[in-house]
Amino acid sequence: MPAELRRLAVLLLLLSARAALAQPWRNENYERPVDLEGSGDDDPFGDDELDDIYSGSGSGYFEQESGLETAVSLTTDTSVPLPTTVAVLPVTLVQPMATPFELFPTEDTSPEQTTSVLYIPKITEAPVIPSWKTTTASTTASDSPSTTSTTTTTAATTTTTTTTISTTVATSKPTTTQRFLPPFVTKAATTRATTLETPTTSIPETSVLTEVTTSRLVPSSTAKPRSLPKPSTSRTAEPTEKSTALPSSPTTLPPTEAPQVEPGELTTVLDSDLEVPTSSGPSGDFEIQEEEETTRPELGNEVVAVVTPPAAPGLGKNAEPGLIDNTIESGSSAAQLPQKNILERKEVLIAVIVGGVVGALFAAFLVMLLIYRMKKKDEGSYTLEEPKQANVTYQKPDKQEEFYA
């Protein structure tokens, strides 16, 4: 190393000496051509740039400047160690940065797994709700005897599954309303159904009701198995067609859990309650008649008879084959009735009559007042003396006493 440094120092000294000798010699002998009369002074170039442009006598002194450039190239040898040291620094900086990033993903993965485990039970609860919806939809076709024969087999299979959840069976009657309601109503009903399920989970109640459901399902399977297929049959006009559609509907329904689990029948009671206000508008006569029909075949079930009244509006919809979507039609009919019969209402008629009378009296009063004023003007009640008196009273404040005051 000391030998190399010495060589570099010697080279630098030689180059500096050459440059020092060349520059004064150039300054003494080399002169730039000057044009006093021309525009030579107007050149925008600086002194350094003019040296390159004006070559003078063409003696080629510029070669010595190239020698200076060689000196610069020699300096690159000394700067070689500098990038090596600089290269080491970013490496050290990058290493500590890489370690924390590696640690964070490991920590993040563990909580994600735990959260996924928590979400799994929630997902399992969600499919149970649609199964209740499907089961609750089709209990209403109790009138046709053919449907009862087809559903007896399904009831026998479901008895095993319903032992734990038999508390909900009592409420299966109101499920008939869901067929006609659109999917929006069914969703709302499912939310309420979940809330009711929690109170029914008490152990003593389930043990008593399970026995009742098993006995009920085999003989009186008419209402419960019907609940599964009826969403498809609700749109069909005749009850005979509903019986034919019963076997096909359970297969089409996406939640397969509906035939297996009958706890959805609790939810059906809530669904029927939701549907009562929506469907009550269009037809009240048919609904009342069919309420009795639904309660009579299901009287064999002890608890079912209590729930039947809320389910009646759904049955009324079934009685009318022409109305496929009663919920939408009921809303439209309710909105149209007030528009058509606004004048027929007693309140509106009374308001119109009273308003007309008051308006007529007010108009008559205005007319009488105008007539009265016109008569006074014609009689000359307004004399010319009155304005004179007014002028006199107006001149009083012009007195000096009042002015000073």
Swiss-Prot record:
Species this chain originates from: Gallus gallus (Chicken)
Cellular component, GO annotation: cell surface; plasma membrane
Residues the record marks as site: Cleavage of ectodomain: K346, E347
Biased composition (Low complexity): 191-201
Tissues of expression: Proximal chondrogenic central core of embryonic limb buds where cartilage differentiation is being initiated.
Glycosylation sites: S39, S55, S57, S59, S66, S280, S283, S330
Protein family: Belongs to the syndecan proteoglycan family.
Signal sequence interval, chain numbering: 1-22
TM stretches of this protein: 348-372
Residue ranges of the region described as Disordered: 31-59, 134-159, 191-301
Protein name (record): Syndecan-3
Membrane protein topology class: Single-pass type I membrane protein
Alphabetically ordered keywords of this record: Developmental protein, Differentiation, Glycoprotein, Heparan sulfate, Membrane, Proteoglycan, Signal, Transmembrane, Transmembrane helix
Extracellular compartment segments: 23-347
An individual GO BP term: positive regulation of substrate adhesion-dependent cell spreading
